[in-house]
């Protein structure tokens, strides 16, 4: 075994703030936090729906709290931001080739947003 001390580069807790690429990545990954709150609220809402009308009314009054509404709006914005970054990466990760020609990136991204809009409209009409 060697007596040499190996070089260990110092890593601060805020290392990601220095590089715009990593800062963007961390912001993108942080969008999960409001989504976790939204998912927990929906789970409790399903539980209240099963428990009966009084529990359901209590959950509805909780969901109408302005702080909860703001958190749900943040969750929606975070979800849309996450989807936009995911959709813009998709053509680079998995390029689609039709008859030997690569499909334009904007067509792929717009097709994904069209699918989101169609599914959202279908669910809106269904409910």
From Swiss-Prot:
Pfam families in the cross-refs: Fumarate_red_C (PF02300)
Location(s) in or outside the cell: Cell inner membrane
Major site of localization recorded for this protein: membrane
CC terms in the record's Gene Ontology section: fumarate reductase complex; plasma membrane
Keywords in alphabetical order: Cell inner membrane, Cell membrane, Membrane, Transmembrane, Transmembrane helix
Domain of life: Bacteria
Gene Ontology MF term list: succinate dehydrogenase activity
Transmembrane segment boundaries: 30-50, 67-87, 107-127
Membrane-topology annotation of the record: Multi-pass membrane protein
Similarity field: Belongs to the FrdC family.
UniProt cross-references to NCBIfam families, sorted A to Z: PRK04987.1
Described function: Anchors the catalytic components of the fumarate reductase complex to the cell membrane, binds quinones.
Assembly and oligomerization: Part of an enzyme complex containing four subunits: a flavoprotein (FrdA), an iron-sulfur protein (FrdB), and two hydrophobic anchor proteins (FrdC and FrdD).
Protein name (database record): Fumarate reductase subunit C
Organism: Photobacterium profundum (strain SS9)
Gene: frdC
């Amino acid at each position: 075994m060697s007596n040499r001390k190996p070089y260990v580069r110092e890593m601060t807790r805020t290392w990601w703030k220095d590089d715009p690429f990593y800062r963007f990545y961390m912001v993108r990954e942080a969008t999960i936090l409001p989504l976790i709150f939204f998912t927990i609220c929906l789970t409790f809402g399903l539980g209240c729906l099963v428990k009966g009308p009084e529990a359901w009314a209590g959950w509805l009054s909780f969901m109408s709290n302005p702080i909860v509404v703001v958190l749900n709006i943040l969750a929606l914005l975070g979800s849309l931001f996450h989807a936009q970054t995911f959709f813009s990466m998709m053509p680079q990760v998995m390029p689609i080739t039709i008859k030997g020609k690569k499909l334009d990136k904007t067509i792929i991204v717009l097709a994904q947003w069209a699918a989101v809009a169609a599914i959202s409209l279908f669910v809106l009409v269904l409910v």
